[in-house]
């Protein structure tokens, strides 16, 4: 409502289909395509938490749900054994049916929840799953999770897996992501892959990368972005700002100079 009442955009509205015809600004719902994107952050964290509870509490019956909740509330202090078992549970990003099915469920629930509401402009809310850098900020404000994640740790970036959880390589990660119906994310999603530069120098490596990406899209994937970087150079650039001004990294649908991040 603030944009509608105090921040109209007449120039851009002139260039948007529907606004001139209806005599309404885009902030007033004049556009033909009048949707508002809302990003879901923490898909993998939620899926991993559900999978860990399923595995440790219900399948193995190693601990009760009360014991898991108690450990989470304590940030696993004095409950390191429970945390180790939760961390060892199946994780999204490894082409495993259980956590991947939970990720699909989380995405569908998020889509269904948004579909029940409309914006102040009268348009639909549509889901997307890209976090830019807010997965770090959100994680810093969130308590521990049943996935084994400790208080304050970053969430998974966009639609990727949690940090360090992809143990079966990039093909498995892409297979997990491809199980999510891209039609449930009309506002898009981001999936980041990172590779060490020395591994990508040969023609054969580039051919493997091409096949990897093409296979992902053939299975219904929507978006993947690649960072091919030398970790040593990144560390040097971080510790010595200005020494490597030309390093460009992919963030979330856009590129940025590493020095400026």
What is the meaning of each model-derived region?
Residues 1-261:
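Acidic, glycine-enriched catalytic cores built around paired aspartates
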């Amino acid at each position: 409502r603030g944009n509608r009442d105090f921040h109209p955009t007449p120039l851009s509205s002139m260039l948007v289909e529907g606004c001139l015809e209806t005599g309404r600004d885009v902030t007033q719902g004049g556009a033909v395509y009048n949707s508002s994107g809302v990003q879901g952050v923490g898909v993998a964290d939620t899926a991993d938490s559900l999978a860990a509870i399923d595995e440790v509490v219900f399948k193995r019956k190693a601990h009760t749900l009360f014991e898991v909740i108690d450990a989470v509330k304590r940030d696993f202090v004095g409950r390191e054994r429970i945390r180790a078992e939760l961390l060892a549970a199946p994780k999204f990003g490894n082409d495993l049916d259980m956590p991947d099915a939970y990720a699909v469920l989380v995405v569908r629930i998020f889509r269904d929840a948004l579909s029940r509401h409309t914006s102040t402009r009268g348009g639909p809310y549509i889901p997307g799953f890209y976090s830019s850098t807010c997965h770090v900020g959100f994680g810093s404000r969130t308590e521990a999770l049943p996935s084994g994640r400790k208080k304050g740790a970053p969430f998974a970036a966009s639609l990727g897996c949690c940090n360090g959880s992809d143990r079966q390589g990039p093909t498995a990660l892409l297979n997990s992501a491809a199980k999510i119906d891209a039609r449930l994310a009309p506002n898009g999603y981001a999936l980041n892959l990172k590779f060490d530069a020395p591994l990508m120098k040969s023609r054969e490596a580039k051919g493997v990368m091409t096949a990897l990406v093409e296979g992902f899209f053939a299975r219904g994937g929507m978006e993947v972005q690649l960072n091919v970087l030398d970790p040593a150079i990144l560390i040097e650039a971080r510790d010595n700002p200005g020494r490597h001004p030309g390093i460009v990294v992919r963030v979330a649908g856009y590129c940025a100079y590493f020095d400026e991040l």
